[in-house]
């Protein structure tokens, strides 16, 4: 029977084959006509790539069917070397969750029941009410806006 093979250039070649022929045999015949080695050939029929060991009958290829010939691409992305680091990775700061942390910000006087703030609140408008400043040994610091008040140092 006669089948057609459409090459990359759009040229159509005709091959005389039997339905019992394997795909390997068809590729060998294409090599004889076109000079393309069989290991670089990929034959496609009805959207499926044809495997070398199978026959034309396995793929239901009949007389005057058209196979499409495309070339196999070799390779891919360049292999990358694994990075080696000279120093160990820096440990990230872990946020310490303190239960009932609000109790550290205010003090209730037992006798009068009056509430007093233990920490200074940030006066900046962008921070808003309830944003307390961190109490360092020599300054008050707002972590939200960066406002800093340094204590007067007596010499």
Swiss-Prot record:
Where does cross-link Glycyl lysine isopeptide (Lys-Gly) (interchain with G-Cter in ubiquitin) occur? Answer: 48, 63
Where would I find the C4-type zinc fingers in this protein?
122-145
Disulfide links within the chain:
none
User: What's the protein name?
Assistant: Ubiquitin-ribosomal protein eS31z fusion protein
In the UniProt entry for this protein, what further remark is given in the free-text comments?
Ubiquitin is generally synthesized as a polyubiquitin precursor with tandem head to tail repeats. Often, there are one to three additional amino acids after the last repeat, removed in the mature protein. Alternatively, ubiquitin extension protein is synthesized as a single copy of ubiquitin fused to a ribosomal protein (either eL40 or eS31) or to an ubiquitin-related protein (either RUB1 or RUB2). Following translation, extension protein is cleaved from ubiquitin.
Alphabetically ordered keywords of this record? Cytoplasm, Isopeptide bond, Metal-binding, Nucleus, Ribonucleoprotein, Ribosomal protein, Ubl conjugation, Zinc, Zinc-finger
- Origin organism is Oryza sativa subsp. japonica (Rice)
**Annotated GO biological process:** modification-dependent protein catabolic process; protein ubiquitination; translation
State any single GO MF term. Answer: structural constituent of ribosome
- Annotated cross-link Glycyl lysine isopeptide (Gly-Lys) (interchain with K-? in acceptor proteins) - which positions? 76
Gene3D superfamilies, alphabetized: 6.20.50.150, Phosphatidylinositol 3-kinase Catalytic Subunit, Chain A, domain 1
Q: Does the keyword section mention Ribosomal protein?
A: yes
This protein's GO cellular component annotations are:
cytoplasm; nucleus; plastid; ribonucleoprotein complex; ribosome
């Amino acid at each position: 029977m006669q089948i057609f093979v459409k090459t990359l250039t759009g040229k159509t070649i005709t091959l005389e084959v039997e339905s019992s022929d394997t795909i390997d045999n068809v590729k060998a015949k294409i090599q004889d006509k076109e000079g393309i080695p069989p290991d670089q050939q990929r034959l496609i029929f009805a959207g499926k790539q044809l495997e070398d060991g199978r026959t034309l009958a396995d793929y239901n290829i009949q007389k005057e069917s058209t196979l499409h010939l495309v070339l196999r691409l070799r390779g891919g992305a360049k292999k990358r070397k694994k990075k080696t680091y000279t120093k160990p990775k820096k440990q990230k700061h872990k946020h310490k969750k303190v239960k009932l942390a609000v109790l550290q910000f205010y003090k209730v006087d037992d006798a009068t029941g009056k509430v007093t703030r233990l920490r200074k609140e940030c006066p900046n408008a962008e921070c808003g009410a309830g944003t307390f400043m961190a109490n360092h040994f020599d300054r008050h610091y707002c972590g939200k806006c960066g406002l800093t008040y340094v204590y007067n140092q007596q010499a």
